[in-house]
Swiss-Prot record:
Catalytic residues, chain numbering: 110, 209
EC number: 2.8.1.13
Single annotated GO MF: tRNA-uridine 2-sulfurtransferase activity
Family: Belongs to the MnmA/TRMU family.
Keywords per UniProt: ATP-binding, Cytoplasm, Disulfide bond, Nucleotide-binding, RNA-binding, Transferase, tRNA processing, tRNA-binding
The protein, known as: tRNA-specific 2-thiouridylase MnmA
Ranges for region Interaction with tRNA: 159-161
Cysteine pairings via disulfide bonds: 110-209
Gene: mnmA
Keyword Membrane: no
Length: 383
């Protein structure tokens, strides 16, 4: 198996190496295809739990794994310290979003800032013609004769990471390559084993690499302790049903952990961070008719997401990485960039991404943005 990335043999390519099997196989395939590969690993954080914890990324043992893999492949390897940058741009942003009552996606923010901005600059400084990553997403030239690449879902739906890469710009996509986009994970592991790489059976990294044991509140409490300030759990009808231990413990659609004794099932339908209130209500209160976007990104035919909204562009909108896209349209409503669903979506959370795909070509990513607000079918304004 060889990596076809549309560059002449001998071209220099920087491979972003996290120490995991995907990025290692990416580097190995490129080297075997005759490219001048330079491996680069970013040290992003360093807490004690990350040194030996399975599923960590870009710290401790992972850096050693990347270095040993580069030696095995026979390519130069550099480690760059981006810990302070990562803390400022990703970890602190993550904590601040929860303080605002949002549910952030740090992987998207990391791709936006550290990986696809800072690391791309490093790759260019090293004289590279492209940078390759181990993401499961496809970069392809359009079939209509266009000269700009498209971002597309991975061939393996179970591993598709297009949701997390919606903010990739046209300029970044010109420079990026994703050799694993057409492969599935068993094939990648088989390639790693065939190459004699010691990380062939290494566990996949966790979604939030800097959160020890999956307890994100541990990180927030350490750097933003005010997030643990108690407040009221309030029903939509105004009744105070109980107390909570901090708004950072909750997300829209959550049912467990409310610690309230009521007969009917209740869900978190709104978080009023200013008043430290967690608002709960019936499931139907989660149904969302439309949402507004911020920090939009666009790869479609129009020049911008706003222009597409003015055109009433039809889209398939995906509001969680675990959900399939649903039909809707872009619109400008009261000056706000909006997505209006044909039906209704449940549990749409501010801070998450809304990723837009092409209804005529559902694997093609058109762009997206972060969810700034929602309009529910049930009026929540009283809460």
């Amino acid at each position: 198996m060889r990596a076809a990335v549309g560059l002449p043999e001998g071209a220099r390519i920087v491979a972003a190496m996290s120490g995991g099997v995907d990025s290692t196989v990416t580097a190995a395939l490129l080297a075997r295809a005759g490219y001048d590969v330079v491996g680069v690993t970013l040290q992003l954080y360093d807490h004690g739990a990350a040194i030996s914890r399975k599923g960590a990324c870009c710290a401790g043992q992972d850096i050693l794994d990347a270095r040993m893999a580069a030696e095995r492949i026979g390519i130069p390897h550099y480690v760059l310290d981006y810990e302070s940058r990562f803390r400022e741009q990703v970890i602190e942003d993550f904590a601040d979003a929860y303080l605002r009552g949002e549910t952030p996606i740090p992987c998207v923010r990391c791709n936006q800032t550290v990986k696809f901005r800072d690391l791309l600059d490093v790759a260019r400084d090293l004289g590279a013609e492209a940078m390759a990553t181990g993401h499961y997403v496809q970069r392809a030239m359009p079939g209509n004769g266009g000269n700009r690449p498209e971002l597309r879902r991975a061939a393996d739906p179970a591993k598709d990471q297009s949701y997390f890469l919606f903010a990739t710009t046209r300029e970044q996509l010109d420079f990026l390559r994703f050799p694993l986009g057409g492969m599935d994970k068993p094939t990648v592991r088989a390639v790693a084993a065939g190459l004699g790489l010691s990380i062939a059976d290494k566990p996949d990294s966790q979604d939030i690499c800097f959160v020890p044991e999956g307890k994100y509140t541990t990180v927030i409490d350490r750097i933003r302790p005010q997030g643990a300030e108690a407040g009221d759990v309030v029903h939509l009808d105004g009744r105070v049903l109980g107390r909570h231990e901090g708004v950072t413990r909750y997300t829209i659609g959550q049912r467990r952990g409310l610690n309230i004794a009521v007969g009917d099932p209740l869900f978190v339908v709104k978080i009023n961070a200013d008043k430290r209130q967690v608002i709960v209500g019936p499931r139907e209160a989660l149904l969302t008719a439309s949402l507004t976007l911020k920090e939009g990104s666009w790869l479609g035919a129009q020049d911008s997401l706003e222009a597409a909204a003015e055109d009433g562009q039809r889209v398939l909108a995906r509001v969680r990485s675990t959900r399939e896209p649903v039909p809707g349209r872009l619109a400008m409503i009261d000056g706000a960039l909006s997505v209006v669903f044909d039906g209704a979506e449940e549990g749409v959370a501010p801070g998450q991404a809304c990723v837009l795909y092409d209804p005529a070509d559902p694997d093609r990513v058109l762009g997206g943005g972060f969810i700034a607000g929602t309009t529910r079918q049930m009026d929540l304004n009283a809460a």
